[in-house]
Amino acid sequence: MTTGKIVQIIGAVVDVEFPQGEVPRVYDALNVVDAQERLVLEVQQQIGGGVVRCIVMGSSDGLRRGLTVENTGAPISVPVGTKTLGRIMNVLGDAIDECGDIDAEEHYAIHREAPSYEEQSNSTELLETGVKVIDLVCPFAKGGKIGLFGGAGVGKTVNMMELINNIALQHSGLSVFAGVGERTREGNDFYFEMQEAGVVNIEKPEESKVAMVYGQMNEPPGNRLRVALTGLTMAERFRDEGRDVLLFVDNIYRYTLAGTEVSALLGRMPSAVGYQPTLAEEMGVLQERITSTKQGSITSVQAVYVPADDLTDPSPATTFAHLDATVVLNRNIAAMGLYPAIDPLDSTSRQLDPLVVGQEHYDIARGVQSTLQRYKELKDIIAILGMDELSEEDKQVVSRARKIEKFLTQPYHVAEVFTGDPGIYVPLKDTLAGFKGLLAGDYDDVPEQAFMYCGKIEDALEKAKKL
């Protein structure tokens, strides 16, 4: 095992000098020998003269020039397999839940090749979420990649938690949750919610269904940049065992941002809007590995923060290309008090195809979108001239569109503590029946308030009797 000496420290970036001919490879993990606690460096560049530039997987406080560093000769390796279930780990795979060490039989390197084209499989099997607007206009595929796009405070994390509640609890498979640069409070809440739901069992960890990997907001950029790969490596292991895995990543934008911080510290010239020049490649390295093979599937749900609500920002724009379904959250819908604030006109899915979902589902979804689009076009006329100037046909469109907008809302299980309304899981067949009736005009005489925050159409009709 070769050793070197620290020669320069710039924040989260450290230069280490090794003897000529024994220089570590890019992505090798180095251990700082004299550090108070375990500190790992990851090689990013070989800059000549036996010197390598590394990022620190932890705080660089207390580091000084001249400290001895050992080369492990391999990339960072993390525990994989069933021993990780029910546990909270950091970027290095160390347990941070005070429940003892993880004695996994196997460790995988976090840097791995994506599966080849021959190994990959594509599926058109639908994954029901129980959320009306998602199941109707942007249905998810089992083994697909789903992105939740939204600005600050429009409900990405709440929607993510509801999907975990509806899919992970209904789906008997295993899940991996990667918290990338998000709030520690949210990670804490998630852990306790999973315990209450029985998905995490502290007494009998082998009965748990979820592994959690956290690299939170307060951690150095190296941790936030690599924690998504740590979570993905654990999910890949379950997939290769022939299981169907759910991978939840909150938040992909923080992964990009950590890359930007590291890129600046490494001295690279920034590109558009100050992002790293390797943005597309870094995103591709992560996203290409999130895929289903002939052995098993990885279905991933990724929250993507949209800076200043600008979907053309390079970070969300780069993410779009990799996804099968995009769920776009809209601040204007949230401002009207309609939750979930998912925009049915902006949200898309490759699965919304008559060959996949069937002709009836496709026609209902497109009918809902065309009604809402027509209402959007008429809003300017209504604002200037009022409703009276519209033709009878347009008045009918507006009336139905307003009911559809209200019927797209529903109470969430995870928001029960705030709203006091019990959450509702709506099966797809009930969603389709409700919207089909609304488009056909079966409920033209029902007041629109009755459609707010209800599940099936029968619930709205019951509500109407009390109005």
Curated annotation (Swiss-Prot):
Nucleotide-binding in keyword set: yes
Pfam families: ATP-synt_ab, ATP-synt_ab_N, ATP-synt_VA_C
Membrane topology: Peripheral membrane protein
Gene3D superfamilies in UniProt: 2.40.10.170, Bovine Mitochondrial F1-atpase, Atp Synthase Beta Chain, Chain D, domain 3 (1.10.1140.10), P-loop containing nucleotide triphosphate hydrolases (3.40.50.300)
Keyword annotations: ATP synthesis, ATP-binding, Cell inner membrane, Cell membrane, CF(1), Hydrogen ion transport, Ion transport, Membrane, Nucleotide-binding, Translocase, Transport
Catalyzed reaction equations: ATP + H2O + 4 H(+)(in) = ADP + phosphate + 5 H(+)(out)
Enzyme class: translocase
Complex formation: F-type ATPases have 2 components, CF(1) - the catalytic core - and CF(0) - the membrane proton channel. CF(1) has five subunits: alpha(3), beta(3), gamma(1), delta(1), epsilon(1). CF(0) has three main subunits: a(1), b(2) and c(9-12). The alpha and beta chains form an alternating ring which encloses part of the gamma chain. CF(1) is attached to CF(0) by a central stalk formed by the gamma and epsilon chains, while a peripheral stalk is formed by the delta and b chains.
Protein name: ATP synthase subunit beta
Species annotation: Aliivibrio fischeri (strain ATCC 700601 / ES114)
Gene name of the record: atpD
